[in-house]
């Protein structure tokens, strides 16, 4: 196939989708163990509180920063004693083109965080290990399911706003 034919195929099929990692980095990290050393004298029965969020920033044309924010707070079951708090902001710069609207939102809130999560999980595991706590292996996160849930919430909010507006117009 000649170069002209390849360009024509790309134009016929639509815009070529590009997703490239430009850089992955740690934006912020914090590890606190406020109740050391007496926490080690207690029986290890942890209660884990895991929070996750993402932030996206449009840096330039087709260039985005995605930041995965993870907070893990572990308290001892049956008490208020905090064993440790670990917070990580794992970020990446991604070149993304050929996507618009919902597809771009899906890429930024699902595919990019999927690429960042293993780095954040390893960093958290390492920090917990350096605090000499038992191993912490965070389970994989289904970012696709989180995106679908988010879109359903957005749609429900839009529908309720429309219904409220219609009720006000009737009265």
From Swiss-Prot:
Annotated coiled-coil segments of the chain: none
Gene Ontology cellular-component terms listed: cytoplasm
SUPFAM superfamilies noted in UniProt: SecB-like
Subcellular location: Cytoplasm
GO molecular function, one term: unfolded protein binding
One GO BP: protein transport
Record-linked InterPro entries: SecB, SecB-like_sf
Pfam short name (any one): SecB
Major subcellular location class: cytoplasm
Purpose: One of the proteins required for the normal export of preproteins out of the cell cytoplasm. It is a molecular chaperone that binds to a subset of precursor proteins, maintaining them in a translocation-competent state. It also specifically binds to its receptor SecA.
NCBIfam families documented for this protein: PRK05751.1-4 (NF004393), secB (TIGR00809)
Protein name (record): Protein-export protein SecB
Recorded name of the encoding gene: secB
């Amino acid at each position: 196939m000649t170069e002209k034919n390849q360009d024509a195929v790309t134009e016929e099929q639509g815009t070529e989708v590009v997703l490239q990692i430009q850089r992955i980095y740690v934006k912020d990290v914090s590890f606190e163990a406020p109740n050391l050393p007496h926490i080690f004298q207690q029986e290890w029965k942890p209660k884990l509180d895991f929070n996750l969020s993402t932030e996206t920033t449009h840096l330039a044309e087709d260039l985005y920063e995605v930041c995965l924010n993870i907070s893990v707070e572990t308290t001892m079951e049956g008490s208020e004693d905090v064993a440790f708090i670990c917070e990580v902001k794992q970020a990446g710069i991604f070149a993304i083109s050929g996507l618009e609207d919902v597809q771009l939102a899906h890429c930024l809130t699902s595919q990019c965080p999927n690429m960042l999560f293993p780095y954040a999980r390893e960093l958290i595991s390492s920090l917990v290990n350096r605090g000499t706590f038992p191993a912490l292996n965070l389970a994989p996160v289904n970012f696709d399911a989180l995106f679908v849930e988010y879109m359903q919430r957005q749609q429900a909010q839009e529908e309720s706003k429309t219904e409220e507006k219609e009720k006000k117009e009737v009265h």
